[in-house]
């Protein structure tokens, strides 16, 4: 006998067996519709079998929410189900069986900051393109490549980057944000917010409102290197069949001296996550470490603060404690005989390709600065050179002039940071961090606009023209900056990266852009067309006319313009 449920409960119940609501059985599918549960009975060898089936109630078809799915008609004379024999019990009129699709992305998760922990495989990128919109603060994900870490971790087109690791970057220069992401390779934690949510928050709270959750000062996971002594590593692991695991320290033991906090949660061993390890697997991993081991741990305060903020306990957030080695920052000033070293591209001891320093001459600037033969070059002027070819790396060094800042690691440090899968640039001491040259940028195209400037000294159309074809470099950049003056005649090249695609194609500072991919430049849609260039298939075809630097300086007073990035960078 079927009895109606109490008011407010959309399920039907039998005296036996007990029937749950549809949401209990199938979960909330965020359809925005009330559900009732139809009871379907069928005959088989065991007799009658009853199974609940969720059915949406009739609703006004004209009332829809943009985030809700459109449902089929809910009233029908068809039978509910015919999977196991002829149905013998159901609703009247009979309602069709509606099979819910898989869970769509939670729309509410897009309304708050999200955390994407990306990892990069050797020779590949994180899998997304970053762009700064013209005339607006912030940095936008303009494309996510399928099958990449960015896609797997939920990064979406239109997301705005609020923070890189624990550093808020929303109001930083575009080039600085690109530099931070590249310097964090092979792992980076991005805090992002969907574009529509960001726009609403800014409209309601103002441009200076703090939208990004970050850890407090000194509250960060720790990367601790422990060397075994007569008492072992100086910790034991809480017993359980599977992670998570917490550490119990021996007073005065090796772990305590290495900076492991009391009651710390164990996250990684030698760069490998132990979150899903069994206790036996963890024991074996520690035993295989030999006489020393590197642990990523989080103290109780860090764990609690991350839980409250929703932050993952991610390795790129870590600070180093008692590390066996660290990167070195070398400052060189060229002498009469040069810098005194040779840069060579080769594979390291671990098989990874890179740029290595050899033939360090005694008595010359490189040796005096502390360079050692066999050092791997990590960065030039604070900018990572990972993934760059030999020629582009040489060009970056030459572009620094007579004073060069190089970040290097010796073979031991190279092996260590490769093992823990973290960039050595994350562990530079603040006093050693090299300052990047002012105005440097990884953006491939930049637009400058200052309506206060007037062109009074040069003709509007330069004479002569030539055509250049450009292909993007390893970082997705064409290697030049494009500027203009609102009242000036044309767009012009304001900077060319040495060794980049633009330099190889023959672009020079002062060249004026006449055409881009066959379209004349000089109309009202120039900026819109430039913003679409990152999506265009290479090569980039530019028709140029030369202008002398003298004429350029007369046209644009030094320091009179401000750059906005237009094109995207592959990260």
From Swiss-Prot:
The keyword Cytoplasm applies. The modification Phosphoserine is found at residue 395. Residues 52-72, 432-459 are annotated as: Disordered. Expressed in kidney and the gastrointestinal tract. Not detected in brain, heart, skeletal muscle or cells of hematopoietic origin. It holds the Pfam family PDZ. GO terms for cellular component: apical junction complex; apical part of cell; apical plasma membrane; brush border; cytosol; plasma membrane. Residues 115-196, 223-301, 329-412, 467-548 form the PDZ domain. It is a peripheral membrane protein. GO terms for molecular function: guanylate cyclase inhibitor activity; ion channel inhibitor activity; protein-membrane adaptor activity; signaling receptor binding; ubiquitin-specific protease binding. CDD domains: PDZ_NHERF-like. GO terms for biological process: monoatomic ion transport; negative regulation of cGMP-mediated signaling; protein localization to plasma membrane; receptor guanylyl cyclase signaling pathway; response to toxic substance; water transport. Residues 433-444 have a biased composition (Low complexity). Disulfide bonds: none annotated. Keywords: Cell membrane, Cytoplasm, Membrane, Phosphoprotein, Repeat. It is found in: Cell membrane; Cytoplasm. Phosphorylation at Ser-395 negatively regulates its interaction with SLC26A3. The keyword Cell membrane applies. Its main location: membrane. InterPro entries: NHER, PDZ, PDZ_sf. Acts as a regulatory protein that associates with GUCY2C and negatively modulates its heat-stable enterotoxin-mediated activation. Stimulates SLC9A3 activity in the presence of elevated calcium ions. Interacts with the C-terminal region of GUCY2C. Interacts with the C-terminal region SLC9A3 and the interactions decrease in response to elevated calcium ion levels. Interacts with the C-terminal region of SLC34A1. Interacts with USP2 isoform 4. Interacts (via the third PDZ domain) with SLC26A3 (via PDZ-binding motif); interaction leads to decreased expression of SLC26A3 on the cell membrane resulting in its reduced exchanger activity. This is Na(+)/H(+) exchange regulatory cofactor NHE-RF4. It comes from Homo sapiens (Human). The lineage of its organism: Eukaryota, Metazoa, Chordata, Craniata, Vertebrata.
